[in-house]
Amino acid sequence: MKEYAILLDDTYCVGCNSCAYRCIQEFRYHDQAAKGLFRTFVNINDDGMYQKRCMHCEAPDCVENCPVKALTKSESGQVLYDAQKCIGCQTCVRMCKFHVPQFDADAKKIVKCSMCAHRVGEGKKPACVEVCPTGALQFGEYEEMLKKAKTISAKNNLKIYGMKENGGTHVFVLAKNEPTSFGYVKVQAKDIKKKVSMSDTVTVPTAIAAVAIGGFKKFSERRTRIEAQEKDKESKE
């Protein structure tokens, strides 16, 4: 199975947010975007353009800690999210070192990039890469993108972000200035001892936590339903 990666050359990004608009259209999350929740978005800063998106870590903390396995890592390298399994516990929000997952309080779900796994599976590029007008975003096989990032970095004296942070990611950012100076989170570099995959099983403590949280969710839903019924009854009286 081929692994893929995205290469973002910040020196070509003009902050037009075509990537964000195209992403909204692709996944039809206009309501969430209206609340300021995005799968990807570019913030313009003096030192560079900070593009907030999932970094698709080699060993994602969100996947390792999700109690119900709503987050998994595909063999292609993407960190995927299953909203049907999600119980809204926000563990991923707390555990992500890159501060990526955003919680939709109304839907009780999270919002994050999937690297357009559905498009990649069809042989297409992610929507954001396809629409980028300046070529700031590139997509390809992991080793190819990594090699290209190193080559461009050496040639133009650019910083590389995402190659070693948190043990490595599937998103490489090239920038003239230190990426952490214009929005990217400072994350410690570390070696990967074990890759997390979709076949990884849930540990016993995690399974127990899943049952507990699941019970709490049912209790909360029942309480909300009862309160709604009581309010409806009072309004009729």
Stretch-by-stretch model annotation:
Residues 1-237:
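Non-ligating segments of multi-cofactor redox enzymes
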